[in-house]
Amino acid sequence: ARLQSIAVAAVSHKPLGRGEGGGQSMVSRVTTVAFQGIEAKPVDVQVQIGPGQVAFTIVGLPDKAVGESRERVRSALIASGLSLPAKRVTVNLAPADLPKEGSHFDLPIALALMAAMGALPAAELERYVVLGELALDGTISPVAGVLPAAIGANTLARGLICPAACGAEAAWADPEMEILAPVSLIQLANHFKGTQILSRPQPKLSANPLVLPDLAEVRGQESAKRALEIAAAGGHNLLMIGPPGAGKSMLAMRLPSILPPLSPRELLEVSMIASIAGELADGKLSERRPFRAPHHSASMAALVGGGIRARPGEVSLAHNGVLFLDELPEFQPQVLDGLRQPLESGETVIVRANHRTSYPSRVQLIAAMNPCRCGHAGEPGHVCRRGERCASEYQSRLSGPLLDRLDLRIEVPAVAASDLLRPAQGESSATVAERVARARRRQSERFAALGVAARTNAAAGARLIEQVAAPDAAGLDLLQSAADALHLSARGYHRVLKVARTLADLDGAEAVSRLHLAEALSYRGAALERRAA
């Protein structure tokens, strides 16, 4: 499928009349992009070479990396056989109120300078969008964000000039799109002269050589495997509580093996975020869903996003995939609470004094934790070293609103020795993945027929899930009594309906029955409270 998205850039060149100093001033314009989230905003790079005191000035709200471009551009031009004229060189990045970040402004500034000096044909540059970083020897280094820029350039029927290392990434925008991916300024200049023709780079898919861990390798834990299948089928969040060594991490690591591959639209979204973060290895796209497992020492900026340049965090890099948080209570409470908005809205918003940045963050949260700091609270014959309050104090690090967003909460007991000695006889990931794929197709077809954008039951809104998961009379009675007994919030009520709808989809049932609701409520039960008691 051809990737479609946001608009970015165009290129133009315009000579001006004589300046006040009596000499002729030349202004060349090359439009590049500045990134806000995965959106590329057009930036007009205006270069003027005119009379006056010899200087090289960059204005237009540049950050430090952009401000340093003057030295990289100057050295790259000298290495390429050109030198700046002994005149006043002014570079304006418009609009001035849009923050300019990153080193990808080097190449458009250099090309605008070369066009103003007559070293490159300005008319040819009008057909391209330009971005790239320059090394001191005139070579062009890779930069982040080439894929969003290429998609936008294709939307405007423009070509793209980007570093050679990013050519494969840019080629995904459209098979007919004109892309120049030079190694150096000299190679690009020779291409425009006709002495060295650059061939179009070709798109690449990651080979994914690593075999994913198989669910059949997990001994015992049949109830946990069932919960994992439900989570995969409906895109539900899952919390596993159990002692050390019970297999919680082992189960989580096998979730990607039963998830369906990315759809073309999901592949686009995932790849654009990876491109912005500079994590698109060799420009190759992968159909596997992201699986991110940050350490519990991760900061707010690392997990949710932020920093000086408002970069995407782990929750955004896991978009359309899995975010696995092991040892959940060991994360800083304020960091975990920062996940509440992305889990609810599917979007991370980072606000700065002068701009607002958002990243898609529709993730499936899989969390694992011990019941207490000792790890064995609630087990027969075990007494916590820290006393009866060990479990309650440990679990109090998790806020109620965060727990309310976890659709499935299960206990993962210690594996019995008999299960470890018995040969593995469980279902393979391929078998479970087939059932998951059928359930997801039912959801996709149902939501498409209703004309809504949701793809999974977990992503459905409250009104929509009430419509598609309306229980029968017996199920309604059970739900009403359980809502009082479990003190379900409005969010908890709707999440029970979502899980019940997924159970019905796994069974191939059109309607949600009492049995589906009963099982959904069992996963909403007070697993934490039982362990803490």
Predicted regions and their residues:
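Walker B catalytic acidic pair
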Residues: 326-327, 338
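Short loop/turn elements that form and flank the Walker-type P-loop nucleotide-binding site
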Residues: 84-87, 124-125, 155, 175, ...
